[in-house]
Amino acid sequence: MIYEVELSEQADNDLRGIFEYIAFELQSPENASGQLDRLEEQILSLDIMPERYRKYENEPWKSRGLRVLPVDNYVIFYIPDSNKKVVTILRVMYAGRDIENQLKFHTKQSETITSFSANM
């Protein structure tokens, strides 16, 4: 079954921040484009069998169904809803960050969710 993939406002900001950091801080726009392409490709792949990646191991996120998709040095956090056939991308973060602290401040209720397509 094909799922619709949605991107939270925070995840969209995360992707923009990753691109800007690599392109401008590291002065490598080609690498920034390549990294963004790889992240987008993996996000879009979640339209089929999104449960194939592991659940996040810590509560309260584990019981909420949060899953983790590693891509290079980054992790994509998402929740699949099998009833609605929707995958919501919550965060995209550098794997070396304090992930617990970043997730603690994330509240889905305050998020704006948008449909995700390859034409970001």
Annotate each language-model stretch with its function:
Residues R38, R52-R54, R67, R91, ...:
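Basic side chains
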Residues M49-N83:
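Basic/aromatic recognition patch in beta-strand/loop cores that engages polyanionic ligands
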Residues V71-V75, I79-M120:
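Enriched for short, Lys/Arg-rich terminal
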